[in-house]
Amino acid sequence: MQIYPLRFVPNKINFDFMNFKKVSYSFSIILSLISLIWIGIYKFNFGIDFVGGIVIEVRLDRAPDLPKMRAVLSALGIGEVVLQNFESEHDLSIRFGSSSEENLMKNIDIIKTSLRNNFPYNFEYRKVDFVGPQVGRHLIEAGAMAMLFSFLAIMVYIGVRFEWYFGFGILIALVHDVILALGFMSITKLDFNLSTIAAVLTIIGYSVNDSVVIYDRIRENLRKYHKKNITEIINLSINETLSRTILTVITTLLANLALILFGGKAIHSFSVLVFFGIIAGTYSSIFISAPILTIFANRKFNKKVIER
């Protein structure tokens, strides 16, 4: 039995992506500026990982219904509430932010009353701690360093595998994706917490993967078509990898959609941000990182690009 490959576009498709180069550049610059301006004015909706808050440790007589408990506590109107087990399924950590110290005891009483009225458990409150914002500043610095090191590692990898100007194209695309992701997070008021930093790093990885696939085909076509100019080669390479790109983005979005619908509040911000980032990363790999190579069209491509 013969197996045919799954394709979403015709084999001989020849869509002129490069014809939209100036439009895509202008569109991306406008979106990036809007994102930066919005972030500058409205900032982020920082979660308790960054602004500090209260940590309540409680032991229950049996395993709690965490999804229901999250829903009940989130409806209290005291901001983000994070619940998670530690040590055992009977031990629960409840974390929430507080706008002022005056509200601390009031919010603690609200939570205790809500738990007592809505759940038939025996609660043993073992510890109540205040987590200051200085911890949040440390986490912000750690997150920024994580993104910086990921950029540097990617640049080294691309420089070794291709050439430095390929790395330049990917760097521009990554900066574009991160700015749009942060702008989207600010506009939609998604919680800025440790999971959203993980989401940004996931977006970076996805965008690089998409761009490397196209770059690899560009390098291969440079070997095959010596008489074609760089614009034709880039167009050809994007079209040849288009079916793979569409298949990858659809399957990844569907998997991520399941997380958005069924993953619960704990990973909601992560899932929504990754969903947006996958779309942005796919766009940037086609319309930004590849067309940027035409900047070097008037230069002779290094032999190492063709020989590798």
From Swiss-Prot:
Name the Pfam families on file. Answer: Sec_GG (PF07549), SecD_SecF_C (PF02355)
GO MF annotation, one: protein-transporting ATPase activity
The family classification in the record reads: Belongs to the SecD/SecF family. SecF subfamily.
Q: What does this protein do?
A: Part of the Sec protein translocase complex. Interacts with the SecYEG preprotein conducting channel. SecDF uses the proton motive force (PMF) to complete protein translocation after the ATP-dependent function of SecA.
Q: What is known about its subunit structure?
A: Forms a complex with SecD. Part of the essential Sec protein translocation apparatus which comprises SecA, SecYEG and auxiliary proteins SecDF-YajC and YidC.
Superkingdom in the source lineage: Bacteria
State any GO CC term: plasma membrane
Q: List, alphabetically, the InterPro entries matched.
A: SecD/SecF_arch_bac, SecD/SecF_bac, SecD/SecF_CS, SecD_SecF_C, SecD_SecF_C_bact, SecF_bac
Q: List the disulfide bonds.
A: none
Write out the transmembrane intervals: 23-42, 140-160, 164-184, 194-214, 246-266, 272-292
Major site of localization recorded for this protein: membrane
* Keyword DNA-binding part of the UniProt annotation: no
What keywords is this UniProt entry annotated with?
Cell inner membrane, Cell membrane, Membrane, Protein transport, Translocation, Transmembrane, Transmembrane helix, Transport
Q: What is this protein called?
A: Protein translocase subunit SecF
Q: Give the matching SUPFAM superfamilies.
A: Multidrug efflux transporter AcrB transmembrane domain
Membrane topology note:
Multi-pass membrane protein
- The yes or no answer to whether the keyword Protein transport is present is yes
Protein location: Cell inner membrane
Q: Where is coiled-coil annotated? A: none
Q: Which GO terms describe its biological process?
A: intracellular protein transmembrane transport; protein targeting; protein transport by the Sec complex
